[in-house]
Amino acid sequence: MKTEYIIGILKNVSIFNQLDDENLELLSKKFVFQKIPKDTVIFKENDLGNQMFVIISGVVEVFKEYRKKRKTLALLKRNDFFGEISVFTSLPRTASVQTLSNSEIIVLDQSDLINIIKNNYKFSLNLIKVLSKKLINANAEIQSLTFKNVQNRATTQIL
């Protein structure tokens, strides 16, 4: 895949869009392109992982399974990224990811991402900002689910 094409993609990805052209070019050469068929599990919760992914085309579902029930956490599309938690924490994957359509992604290894963090202050600050927004959204979802559970329990007690 051409470097210019990957640079064009990265300029639209929230964690990479603050990089200058020189760093984008260096980073773009580290990505590996993959075509993934519909219904392919990219990774499962609790898998070990040292790569993050950027979607070029297609849709993927991020989900968790509990007692044979599946809960969709997010639907991701072009210019979205995933897999970063394991890259930064070296912990197992926190959710599973599966393609919902034929998809094209680019993959970046942990060591390459860590190098750009070490060498680019502006990138590091932007990364903190983007990940903080993800945390805020996750906290809002938790709060919403907690409130719904309280309402459901209260309704059940009244009936």
Task: Give the location of each predicted region.
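Short, locally clustered residues in the helix-turn-helix/winged-helix DNA-binding domain
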Residues: 11, 43, 56, 159
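Short, small/polar residue-rich loop motifs at catalytic or cofactor-binding pockets
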Residues: 28-29, 47-49
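Cyclic nucleotide-binding regulatory module and flanking cytosolic helices
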Residues: 1-38, 87, 119
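Solvent-exposed strand-loop boundary residues in beta-sheet-rich modules
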Residues: 66-68
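Short phosphate-coordinating micro-motif centered on Lys-Gly-acidic
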Residues: 41-47
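Cyclic-nucleotide recognition modules
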Residues: 73-129, 136
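Glycine- and acidic-residue-biased ligand/ion/polar-headgroup-sensing regions
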Residues: 39, 50-63, 78-79
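Polybasic "coupling" helices that flank or enter modular domains
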Residues: 118-159
